[in-house]
Amino acid sequence: MTATLTSLNFEHLIVTDPKILADIRNVYATTHYGPEDAEFLKTPGGQQDLDFNTFIRYNQSVRNGLPWVQRVFDMTGKTLIEIGCGTGSSTAAFAYLAKHIYSCDPKENTLPTARARLEALNLTNIDITSHAAPEFFHYCRQNYCDQADAVLFFAVLEHQTLDERIESLRQAWQILKPGGVIIVIETPSRLTYMDHHTTRLPFYSMLPMDVALRYVEHSSRGDFVGSMLKARSEPLAVQEELMIRWGRGISYHEFDLAFPDGGYTIIADGYEREMTDLFPVTFDERLLQGFVAHNGFNIPPAFLRHTLCLILRKGDGAVPAPQRTYTPHVATKLELERLRDRLDLMSIAEIRGELNRLMDRGVAFGHQSGM
């Protein structure tokens, strides 16, 4: 049953008790970081990380994640498997609705924070273990449940290898009950001009791995650059895995590989209000939509967002799953032509403005000044 709109306000779940927040923050600071990180934690970047893992992501899960899912799939009383719980922000949020959550994370240093959060909020309907996917699905079958109503990947798929990613999606599909859902939240797309997730560099998501490894110094993220440079003397396979663990964008290709026969329906595609509030639609996305529409590619709009937030529903035999089709925002040829004209004018204006700015700064084109 889909939730009614009146049930989509979860503001009462926001944690404001300063003692609870301080306790969670302290556990995270002392278990995720060591004494050598004391100075970093005093910096704006360190404080931001503490805030993010104490309350920001939890608040986002409550205000955006819960109503977004509940709008199309009622989680009340359902069994949820969560892959990659991290510090338990999404775990705690969804625990208010689900009957039981079976959750895992391969990073043991994140689990004390998750457990402290759940204890502080008096949430007892969760089992957390230190496992990686896809192995966790086998563990669930042996120890917890044969089937689940939903599987959650919250900011997880981008940190997996290709094999892990495809097998995790397949295992999730197999353990789902008919009519169950796979929930993907906050996973960066590789089909973007800008890598906002890992390097904050343009076109980085499009680079092949060998070029990406050589180009890390250009990133403005000191922690990322330092980590990657430290591994420069390691075998190439070690460097590649480290890059993946930091996060590499994904696309519809992995879903086509995991589900070659289709069989699913996209019941939420990331253009809903809850997700656009978190991740506003960008000019780059509109360009990609226009490109797909112009060429008639059969790519669902869910995979054209710069940050993927989508819910896949497994067929239950009641209604045949429709073929995956792309319904362009531009419905007619005339509208497409008008969109093209607007994009051309916008692009020309932006390019002209940038050229003027560069010329005002005395930037030479094609060669260095004085050469």
Report the location of each language-model feature.
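A C-terminal cap/extension of S-adenosyl-L-methionine-dependent methyltransferases
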Residues: A231-N356, D360
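Conserved N-terminal segment of class I S-adenosyl-L-methionine
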Residues: T2-D146, A150, F154, I166, ...
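Short conserved AdoMet
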Residues: A95-Y96, K177, P260
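SAM-dependent methyltransferase
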Residues: L201-H253
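A short glycine-rich, Lys/Arg-flanked "PGG" loop and its adjoining helix->strand segment in the class I
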Residues: I166-P178
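Short catalytic/ligand-binding loop motif for oxyanion handling, primarily in non-cytosolic enzymes
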Residues: S89-A93, T110, Q160, R190-D195, ...
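Conserved class I S-adenosyl-L-methionine
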Residues: I183-A212
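Short catalytic micro-motifs in class I SAM-dependent methyltransferases
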Residues: A155-H159
